[in-house]
Amino acid sequence: MPVVMARDLEETASSSEDEEVISQEDHPCIMWTGGCRRIPVLVFHADAILTKDNNIRVIGERYHLSYKIVRTDSRLVRSILTAHGFHEVHPSSTDYNLMWTGSHLKPFLLRTLSEAQKVNHFPRSYELTRKDRLYKNIIRMQHTHGFKAFHILPQTFLLPAEYAEFCNSYSKDRGPWIVKPVASSRGRGVYLINNPNQISLEENILVSRYINNPLLIDDFKFDVRLYVLVTSYDPLVIYLYEEGLARFATVRYDQGAKNIRNQFMHLTNYSVNKKSGDYVSCDDPEVEDYGNKWSMSAMLRYLKQEGRDTTALMAHVEDLIIKTIISAELAIATACKTFVPHRSSCFELYGFDVLIDATLKPWLLEVNLSPSLACDAPLDLKIKASMISDMFTVVGFVCQDPAQRASTRPIYPTFESSRRNPFQKPQRPLPAQFHSSEPKQRSRPLSASDAEMKNLVGSAREKGPGKLGGSVLGLSMEEIKVLRRVKEENDRRGGFIRIFPTSETWEIYGSYLEHKTSMNYMLATRLFQDRMTADGAPELKIEGLNSKAKLHAALYERKLLSLEVRKRRRRSSRLRAMRPKYPVITQPAEMNVKTETESEEEEEVALDNEDEEQEASQEESAGFLRENQAKDTPSLTTLVENTPKENSVKVREWSKKGERCCKLETQELEPKFNLMQVLQDNGNLSKVQARIAFSTYLQHVQIRLMKDSGGQTFSASWAAKEDEQMELVVRFLKRASNNLQQSLRMVLPSRRLALLERRRILAHQLGDFIIVYNKETEQMAEKKSKKKVEEEEEDGVNMENFQEFIRQASEAELEEVLTFYTQKNKSASVFLGTHSKSSKNNNSYSDSGAKGDHPETVMEEAKMKPPKQQQTTEIHSDKLSRFTTSAEKEAKLVYTSSSSTPFSGPTATLQKIPNTHLSSVTTSDLSPGPGHHSSLSQIPSAIPSMPHQPTILLNTVSASASPSLHPGTQNIPSPAGLPRCRSGSHTIGSFSSFQSAAHIYSQKLSRPSSAKAGSCYLNKHHSGIAKTQQEGEDASLYSKRYNQSMVTAELQRLAEKQAARQYSPSSHINLLTQQVTNLNLATGIINRSSASTPPTLQPIISPSGPTWLVQSDPQAPENHSSPPRSRSLQTGGFAWEGEVENNVYSKATGVVPQHKYHPTAGSYQLHFALQQLEQQKLQSRQLLDQSRARHQAIFGSQTLPNSNLWTMNNGAGCRISSATASGQKPTTLPQKAVPPPSSCASLVPKPPPNHKQVLRRATSQRASKGSSAYAQLNGLQSSLNPAASVPITSSTDPAHTKR
């Protein structure tokens, strides 16, 4: 085959190459030609443009086949050639196999063609395609053979030369006439007249009598486009494609003179009518009789239904085509003899436009040189793609690299090795049926010299029937080549029908041929030797002519197969060719094909009806063929008697070895139980029967997986298809195993493994699934028998018949039954299952040979399995280390994945978080009240081994919590799972302005609304905070840590810097950006410092900012009244709430905002902010003085008892310490600072009109609501500038930050 033939002849023959030759002997794209069948010719497939099959491309690519397109653009031709491995070369290149051009060729180009090169035009084809030349040729034939013999054109005149004759004829009949340019197409320049004065005589035109009685379908005029292929003019060989196009006008036909100018009524050209608003196009290629373009076969079927004689009509059409081409045969054949060096170099596809009148007489309108191959509708693609592919196959492209052609003489395929040693070549391998018994031999093509030298030698041996039709004695080598080429063309004709020469048409039209050469006569006498020697009665000849016409009519009327059907058939044939070869016996082989190609049957179950409809007409035509050729072909009994005795011996031997096959054949003769028929007759299967049928179907799939995993070599397309099938089985096992009541561990094969290994593993896993599935089916049957619920006898079919059907049914039959059962019962849950037990936790998937869990499996487990205490603890202990490296990433996940409704519950939020990190978090009770801190005391016993990593996870989860929660009411989710909050609108503690800011952010910036109040999740590692601190510690720890004078001096200096930045109009917008940066850095320091701190001393960061939690008495009720000292502290932290808001925003979006959010110009917030802008400038200095006085009062009179020290690097190297009081009520400071004028005693929170102004108000308002200890630390942190450090380290070196 071609893959082997491309190698040099000097290669040593090996068994691997012999197997390759044998395996590719029946390649779908190769047909062997020549005297000894040594020349490969490419076979084209129309469906290749859909499949892009590499198996089809490999031949063209191996031989470097090429083409060039000149002066035209045909996308269809380019697509078909490219799909078959051709590559396009430059129009000026001389290395090509095909030149497709849209115009006539120059003589010097024709003379340079080699025998392997082909062009799509003959010289002087304009003798047919120019209207004036066609008219002259027909007139000449009428003068020679009589007017009636060639009356195929309407009465025509060539103007202005015949203007007088036209006027004379018009005076006798004043009907309408049609004017056409002599060299135009697509209806350009065509118009109707009813007076000679309307004609312009400035250029040559053709005037023809208008056929005013056309055949109408639904009152619309139409014509027929026929595709005619001529492969040779000497001898003349004409083919007509079995399918064409019927093109309809868009306006109903009316003979009235008033509509003579309406081209949409009188012209049927597609180029004209597509511009009409009434043009209707059909988008379904299988519907051929709808719209303004039908298939010719659909038109003939319609006429046949109307009682018209379509057989006579198509016989007249063939007569018209043959006479038209014969009229130009002399001129074109003479030009070919003069300019074309090889008889097979040229071919031509003509487009015949034929109009049928009311008497079913066809009239020739015109012949098109290059018929349109545009595919504007699916019907065009189906017809034209099939026609072009069959045309290329008939023409016969020899598989030869065009760059290796010899320049001295015409050649057949030539290879370098053949030219070096043309006389030493191995023999071609024997036919496939002898491979098992005869030695294997290699195949190589002939070189040019070998092909010509062996033509006569090979032809002398071809004297039997089926070769060249008898003896070739007396024929020259050229005549033998021509005879063989014509026979081989007819063997691969596809959808083309040879209408000349045939035994009938030669007798009728042979005398019309004007090119007097011996080739036509030789061809006729050699092709139809039996017909020529038999001098039968005229009645027999007429009967034979009628039978041939009926056969052709049946072929014209049959529906053309669609490209999809062709693709499926070719794929099925490839599967049959890939199966192992068995001894010569048909019956067992067919049974084997059935089992081997069950996957193909599954895909074609729904399309069988379509194929049957399309094959009906083909069977009808085959019936005609059998009837008509019954007299000329031997009978079936004769063929059986003439079969070799070896076959019968092999059949007997095979039957002895395969008694099982014979038993199956005898069983098939018995009437089978048709379960499908029972179901269609309102029968139904029971649940147990449905599961049994489904289990049997799965067993068939398992057997197919195990059987096909043998040591065979399969193609890439087969591997891709099997990979897709295995992927379907894998997906089924993943989902169906979760529906089993019994746990089943599935070890699914990795895609990295080899294909056969994956099939083996998958078959094993499917077998395990079937075993568990059958056990559950048995349990279901036992339960029903115990309960005495006889559903099987009431609803199901007879059990014995059902078991018989199960034993004999194929995979396709079971699939059909299960599909019908599913459609009938509207569900497949009976045999697939719908749910799994909640206690099942052992169904897990592992990918053998792959790293990590399967993503789909993990997601399905996350969706289907609720977290439990054991699983949660295990996962958390395994995955907790990841929190230390991805704290901020998970903080973003919490924000972007949270629920859009407040207090929607942690479950809705945590479903979006990766289960490898947060699968342990469950719902918690969010009810307020002092009794809820009892859950905090349970945490140490639940997680005793996790004292560290407290604040990192806290930053992740607490960022979405409510900032106003009282420490005593914080709820920590535990692995055991706490009850869900009952009320979706429940509020905890007092609200601050943070809720309003978060609400505005969620509305204005389209951020997830998880930042609203009520989404509180805290880390479970802070259980030690619930314990009360020991009282009586020395208060001197605080005085040792802080130097009063240093703090006062530093605070005064930094307060001035803060005022310069915070109260200047230029830095008004960038304030929150600076605070967010400081907050993020401070949070990181808290995380690092907490790692070395005992669990009982670790802080809980308030959601409103990185403050420190004051340990108060757990039983103390909420303090809704704030002392004056607390209020004074809060007024100093007016910018802290904005910092918290931007912290929330930066974590939610992952981007630190460059400026604070500004409301739109039309909102009330903006108007209010503009009014307050001037007031802020006036109040800035007053607020600065108040801040200084407040800070001095704090450090002058503050005494903090029993303190716990905390160190924090805040911003640019700031280290501060704060004390947390515990075991007693917070101490208050005297009120020394006057609150801002805008502060009020009590105000309900609402969306702030301006952030800065409202933050100042909200800060003073919150002072009367929050706890005093809470307020002290908030005020302390808000008053400190990020550039300060205590002890005083005012350096801005980044090293301080990292320390």
Swiss-Prot record:
GO MF terms held by the record: ATP binding; metal ion binding; protein-glutamic acid ligase activity, elongating; protein-glutamic acid ligase activity, initiating; tubulin binding; tubulin-glutamic acid ligase activity
Location of the region described as c-MTBD region in the Swiss-Prot/TrEMBL record: 378-502
The keyword Magnesium is assigned to this record: yes
Binding of Mg(2+) 2, residues: E366, N368
Domain of life: Eukaryota
Region (Disordered): 1-20, 410-449, 591-644, 833-883, 919-948, 960-981, 1090-1131, 1217-1299
Positions with a binding annotation for L-glutamate: R247, Y270, S271, K293, K384
Binding sites annotated in the UniProt record for a protein: R186
Residues annotated to bind Mg(2+) 1: D353, E366
Record InterPro entries: TTL/TTLL_fam
Positions with a binding annotation for ATP: K180, R186, G187, S208, R209, Y210, I211, K221, F222, D223, T268, N269
Domain annotation TTL: ranges: 62-407
Chain positions of site Essential for specifying initiation versus elongation step of the polyglutamylase activity: R186
First-level EC class: ligase
Skewed-composition ranges (Acidic residues): 598-618
Keywords per UniProt: ATP-binding, Cell projection, Cilium, Cytoplasm, Cytoskeleton, Ligase, Magnesium, Metal-binding, Microtubule, Nucleotide-binding, Nucleus, Transcription
Reactions listed under catalytic activity: L-glutamyl-[protein] + L-glutamate + ATP = gamma-L-glutamyl-L-glutamyl-[protein] + ADP + phosphate + H(+); (L-glutamyl)(n)-gamma-L-glutamyl-L-glutamyl-[protein] + L-glutamate + ATP = (L-glutamyl)(n+1)-gamma-L-glutamyl-L-glutamyl-[protein] + ADP + phosphate + H(+)
Principal location class: other
Function: Polyglutamylase which modifies tubulin, generating polyglutamate side chains on the gamma-carboxyl group of specific glutamate residues within the C-terminal tail of tubulin. Preferentially mediates ATP-dependent initiation step of the polyglutamylation reaction over the elongation step. Preferentially modifies the alpha-tubulin tail over a beta-tail. Required for CCSAP localization to both polyglutamylated spindle and cilia microtubules.
Family: Belongs to the tubulin--tyrosine ligase family.
Name this protein carries in UniProt: Tubulin polyglutamylase TTLL5
Organism: Chlorocebus aethiops
